[in-house]
Amino acid sequence: MWPLWPAVPERRSQRLRQLAAPQRAACLAHPFVRGIASGSLPAAVFARWVVQDWHYLQTYLQVLGTLARTAPCAHARQRWGQMAVLTRDEELDLHRSFAQRFDIAPAQLAGAAVWPGTLAYSAFQVEQANRSYGRGVAALVPCGVGYVTLARALAAESAPADDRYADWIRMYSDPAFAQAVDWMESELDRVDEEEDALAVVYRNGVTWELRFWEHLWQGIPDEFNRG
């Protein structure tokens, strides 16, 4: 009898998901994420995510703008523009809401130092988007896929007692957010660039996601007490 080999997904985005599965599993098992799931994550630790992800999203918006300019068709250019509006008007607004709920003043949110890991992750995405459209897409997709994957997994567990963490899970498992990520993956499928190169970028993107969680978990002392 011939051996039964695992089926190779037809879609590039699914092949790259499969390739990055061990890193995504590590993200789900990370103590920062598990703390959200259980509701036991100290508020001061979660506040790091609120601030650093706020700053990360500022550069993320720039990368969306680059993709909106360099996409090969009008439809894709329009969709990336819509992604920018969604990020600016909804996701950043949600961060403002979380900041208030975690006692982070607006001045602290806007003026807090951007940590080295946040800067490095953002620089990676900017660099890839400047190199080519396909690389920019491959660098950006892992972030959205990562949040949807984590939130869906956490939503399948018992809800955390802390409503703030339950709301975080609801936000990133929301169908509207998932639909936006689905479109991003479909655009990755359509990119006319060499898949091996895109796979390297994609894997690096997932690695940066894992590093970001670890970066937040380790933290920098007295982040909100500087100056």
Question: Which residue ranges define each predicted feature?
Answer:
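Hydrophobic alpha-helical segments
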Residues: 2, 8-9, 16, 121-125, ...
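Active-site-proximal alpha-helical scaffolds that flank and shape metal-associated catalytic sites
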Residues: 5, 51, 75-176, 207
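Hydrophobic/basic alpha-helical segments enriched in Actinobacteria
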Residues: 9-29, 33-36, 72, 172-173, ...
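Short alpha-helical hairpin
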Residues: 17-41, 60, 182-192
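Alpha-helical bundle segments that constitute or directly flank the non-heme di-iron/ferroxidase center
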Residues: 21-27, 40-70, 89-90, 138-148, ...
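Short, contiguous, pocket-lining structural segments
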Residues: 45-59, 86, 176, 180, ...
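Carbohydrate-associated surface elements
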Residues: 115-116, 162, 178-192, 205-206, ...
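Acidic, carboxylate-rich catalytic segments that either coordinate divalent cations
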Residues: 198-227
